[in-house]
Amino acid sequence: MDEWYGQVAPREKLLKYGAAVLTDAELLAIFLRTGIPGMHVMKMAEYLIETFGSLHGLISADYQTLCAHKGIGASKYSQIQAIGELACRCFSSHLMRESVLLNPGITQKFLQNILSHREREIFLVVFLDNQHRVIRHEEMFTGTISSVEVHPREIVREALKVNAAALILAHNHPSGKAEPSQADRLITTQVIKACSLLDIRVLDHLVVGRGECVSFAERGWL
């Protein structure tokens, strides 16, 4: 991957100017390292991102879907999955060190990274200590493509187990639209009531769509 199209190769460009100036395709090409006969690694990276619509779409693709494309086997699938997992862990480690109230943007990005590509509704809870630092996060309930059944008592039980003082609720809408439903508002109220009996605060409920996130707290619904 020394030169491509007569321009500076992605690796050399990164070393000279920093990773931030590289395109998604250039960053992907560095991970993939090699192309296939008749297709340079940059061409492969561009093709994959164009085919799946975005880097996020590519990383979210399952094994069978991705490996249906020429030149993609277990090795390159593993490399692509590693990109997504590294990004997730990077956000997670940053979130674990931060106060959620001081940096809500990181919290939203972290939850979007986990939930926005999921094909079923997932209800996730972030458990916080009394200084609103993250203790852990847990995907507590898994539903269908259009709904998820949530049990407030199980959330309270888990909060007591980890000695949480506060919670952030989050779930995704696989449809891609993040606008909360009446059912979303109802279950939020039920969780708040269950938690309030034990002085556990619900700081927010985030609904994650495709490329967007709606905060109950920002809308004044809590």
Swiss-Prot record:
A Gene Ontology biological process in which this protein takes part is: proteolysis
Query: Which UniProt keywords are given for this protein, alphabetically ordered?
Result: Hydrolase, Metal-binding, Metalloprotease, Protease, Zinc
> For binding Zn(2+), which residues are annotated in this chain's numbering?
171, 173, 184
Which cysteines in this chain are paired by disulphide bridges?
Answer: none
InterPro entries attached to this UniProt entry = MPN (IPR037518), RadC_JAB (IPR025657), RuvA_2-like (IPR010994), UPF0758 (IPR001405), UPF0758_CS (IPR020891), UPF0758_N (IPR046778), UPF0758_YicR (IPR022820)
Q: Start and end of every MPN domain?
A: 100-222
GO molecular function term, any single one: metal ion binding
SUPFAM superfamilies per UniProt: RuvA domain 2-like
Motif JAMM motif, chain ranges: 171-184
- Family statement: Belongs to the UPF0758 family. YicR subfamily.
PANTHER family from the xrefs?
Answer: DNA REPAIR PROTEIN RADC, UPF0758 PROTEIN YEES-RELATED
UniProt cross-references to HAMAP family, sorted A to Z = UPF0758_YicR
- What name has this protein been given in UniProt? UPF0758 protein YPO0049/y0092/YP_0050
Q: Which organism is it from?
A: Yersinia pestis
